[in-house]
């Protein structure tokens, strides 16, 4: 018998029971496949939740989407009017699952596909229409305009042992594939069935009384804000684990920044407790929205309108499994409509709903309350954290002075305290340098970066280079790799990839960039390069911060980006050494010159 994840017994205990079609398919697979096949039911894959994923070691993967639709109903007709305006074509849905596995979820797959398009065939797709007649399938196939090479349409009558064996053979799922090696198999396995986290994998970290109070999970709605480095993400991670222990259910953790999910994953990994990783759904809001829309066959017709449509999920609200705990990081980047959508459709009644943020990092100019706090859908006071564990005292002073200089009439200013054991360990003087460049000179910046790295004897893993512009990051990365022969960790495409994919269209370039962000991790042992906004939430020991001419001047950012908050966010990523290169931006020159003179 095939191996089921979760077990068939536990599948029938889920809060949202399998549909009639799903149950029929699961029983068929149980009766007709041996134990070389693994069956994953509604696995959470970075927001995607395909009905069934079938995998066989050394062979490949098959995604099976189940539809219990009545083809005689309003959303379908033989006159080429298959679906309502809001209902998504199931072919689009299943192809979205497949494309996301290549483009987002499994890092190596995208580059394998780009180098060898044949790799795309290791994942095949099947749509099982439980209530469709043979005639319905035939009409559907003749009307649609899709390449059918990797999709099979079947109904209950064609779901036989003989025919399904033919499908497995056609899709190479019953024999050895030279492309689906052990490394790929293990990569898929980690996403489909995340492993157990043991107590020994965690770390012992001392918490302050306020932090100990805030990591306690309880069914309430709460807002937590704090200065840079005050442990907001640490609290979120420990509260997430405690929430899972309290409810015995899955926890949804939402971010704004694509790559921040990996930072939160690292923080949860530090918790000394035992849990399975599949109990934590960590994802950024936009990917979550798109994935849930796809999971319920909903069309996104206009991203600007649908993302703020507070009734978007109304037609499927009774199908959506609710989370007893939802934790949202970077809430200063959220629109109020997003928060309302999450609470309305995804939070269980009397559920735990906790928001974490810092209005000083409001780089997207979201609306604030009259008292200059972040606008949310939770009433009551904020829980505040004012001690920083990240920043050296001198870096904290720069952040404080920056607030006084640029945020005086915009926000309530922070009084940043340094946590006692942080100060105790900081008995050396951090390094600060400031350069003003009258023109863009990447060779000059590169040579100075290398000179400082050598002088301070810095390990590559402790170094981050951030800029307001992607192009600058690409150029510096190229110089580091070509002239220093060093590997790097990039949050965007390389210069070579940019030149290659620009010729092929921006879609492929965006796919590569998103793949880099989704698979960015902090400890590869190499120098990290990123734009400031993509590094938001992360931290680094030694930071080279590159400030360029006001972005609106050349139109590379839209006017919804606030440069003051962006630069402040960049500064507060730094834990110890800070080196700033300012290219032509007079706005910040006087401030940083004063800092350098007083250092």
Name each region found by the language model.
Residues 26, 69, 215, 540-543:
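Short amphipathic alpha-helical "recognition" segments used for binding
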Residues 84-87, 92-103, 225, 296-301, ...:
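Acidic/glycine-enriched edge-of-secondary-structure segments
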Residues 94, 165, 331, 375-376:
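Intrinsically disordered, low-complexity regions enriched in Ser/Pro/Gly/Gln/His and often acidic
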Residues 203-209, 213, 220-294, 312-313, ...:
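Conserved helicase motor core of SF1/SF2 NTP-dependent helicases
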Residues 295-314:
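Short glycine-rich substrate-engagement loop in P-loop NTPases that contacts/grips substrate
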């Amino acid at each position: 018998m095939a191996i089921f994840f979760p077990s068939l017994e536990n599948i029938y205990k889920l809060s949202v029971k399998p549909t009639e079609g799903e149950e029929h398919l699961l029983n068929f697979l149980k009766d007709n496949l041996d134990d070389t096949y693994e069956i994953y039911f509604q696995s959470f894959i970075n927001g995607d939740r395909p009905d069934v994923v079938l995998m066989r070691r050394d062979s490949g993967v098959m995604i099976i989407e189940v539809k219990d639709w009545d083809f005689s109903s309003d959303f379908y007709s033989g006159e080429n009017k298959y679906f309502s305006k809001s209902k998504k074509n199931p072919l689009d849905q299943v192809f979205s699952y497949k494309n996301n596995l290549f483009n987002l979820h499994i890092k190596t797959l995208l580059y394998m596909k780009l180098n060898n398009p044949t790799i795309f065939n290791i994942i095949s797709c099947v749509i099982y229409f439980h209530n469709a007649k043979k005639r319905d399938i035939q009409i559907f196939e003749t009307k649609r305009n899709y390449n059918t090479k990797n999709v099979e349409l079947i109904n209950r009558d064609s779901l036989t042992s003989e025919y399904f064996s033919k499908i497995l053979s056609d899709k190479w799922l019953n024999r050895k594939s030279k492309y689906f090696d052990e490394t790929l198999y293990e990569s898929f396995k980690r996403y489909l069935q995340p492993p157990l986290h043991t107590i020994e994998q965690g770390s012992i970290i001392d918490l302050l009384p306020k932090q100990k109070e805030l990591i306690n999970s309880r069914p309430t709605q709460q807002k937590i804000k704090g200065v840079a480095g005050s442990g907001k993400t640490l609290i979120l991670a420990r509260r997430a684990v405690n929430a899972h222990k309290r409810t015995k259910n899955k926890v949804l953790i939402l971010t704004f920044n694509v790559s921040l999910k990996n930072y939160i994953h690292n923080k949860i990994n530090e918790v000394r407790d035992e849990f399975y990783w599949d109990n934590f759904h960590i994802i950024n809001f936009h990917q979550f929205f798109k994935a849930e829309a796809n999971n319920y066959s909903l069309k996104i017709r206009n991203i600007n309108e649908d993302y703020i449509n507070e009734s978007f999920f109304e037609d499927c609200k009774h199908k959506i499994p609710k989370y007893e705990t939802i934790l949202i990081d970077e809430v200063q980047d959220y629109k109020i409509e997003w928060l309302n959508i999450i609470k309305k459709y995804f939070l269980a009644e009397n559920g735990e709903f906790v928001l974490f943020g810092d209005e000083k990092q409001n780089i997207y100019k979201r609306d604030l309350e009259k008292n200059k706090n972040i606008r949310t859908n939770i009433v009551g006071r904020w829980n505040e954290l004012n001690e920083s564990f990240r920043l050296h005292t001198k870096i904290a002073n720069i952040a404080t002075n920056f607030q006084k200089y640029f945020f005086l009439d915009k926000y309530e200013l922070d009084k940043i305290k340094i946590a006692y054991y942080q100060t105790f360990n900081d008995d050396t003087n951090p390094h600060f340098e400031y350069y003003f460049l009258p023109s863009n000179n990447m060779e000059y910046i590169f040579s100075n970066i290398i000179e400082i790295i050598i002088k301070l004897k810095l390990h590559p893993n402790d170094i981050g280079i951030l800029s307001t512009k992607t192009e600058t990051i690409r150029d510096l990365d190229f110089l580091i790799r070509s002239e220093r022969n060093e590997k790097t960790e990039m949050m965007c495409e390389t210069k070579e990839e940019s030149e290659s994919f620009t010729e092929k269209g921006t879609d492929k370039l965006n796919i590569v960039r998103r793949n880099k962000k989704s698979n960015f991790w902090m400890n590869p042992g190499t120098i990290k390069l990123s734009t400031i906004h993509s590094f938001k939430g992360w931290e680094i020991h030694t930071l080279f911060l590159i400030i360029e001419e006001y972005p609106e001047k050349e139109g590379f950012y839209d006017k919804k980006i606030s440069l003051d908050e962006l630069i402040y966010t960049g500064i507060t990523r730094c834990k110890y050494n800070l080196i700033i290169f300012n290219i032509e931006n007079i706005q910040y020159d006087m401030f940083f010159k004063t800092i350098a003179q007083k250092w």
